[in-house]
Amino acid sequence: FQQAKAFCGQNPKAREVVAACKKAGYPVVLATNPIFPAVATESRIRWAGLEPEDFTWYTTYENIGYSKPNPAYYQHILTRLGAQAEDCLMVGNDVDEDMGAAQQAGLSVFLLTDCLINREGKDITPYPQGDFDALMGFVQSWA
C-alpha cells in the first residue's frame, strides 16, 4: 500500500485552505470515501502534505457505515459533528461522488477543478467551482 504514494501528488495550497478554515474556526472534516482503515487513510493524508491532526474528523471504514454518493453518508457526518447542513460546505473534486449527494443532504458545495473527476461529462456550471486559489477566495467569503 505504501508504494502507492509514488502516484499521489501534493498541492501546498491544500494545506493553506485547511489552515484558513481552521483559523476561521470551522471544523474541517476529511469526507473521503471510507474504503480504507484509519491507518491507510492517515497515510493518504500525509501523502497529501497534511497531518491527521489537521482534521476534526476523517471518515474510514471503521467509523462510518455509509459511503459516497449516499446522502446518508453526509447526514452521518453532520450528526457526528452536531452540525446543521446549511452551516456546512462540502468541497470535492468528483462530480458524481461529491456534489449531488452533498446537495441532497442540504450542504452547500464547491467543486474543486484541480484533478476534476467527471466520469459522465456532466454539466458543472451549476456548481460554484474553481482551482485552489478560487476555493481560498470562496472560503474567505463564505458564511
Named regions from a protein language model:
Residues 1-29:
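Short, acidic loop-to-helix structural element flanking the phosphoryl-transfer center
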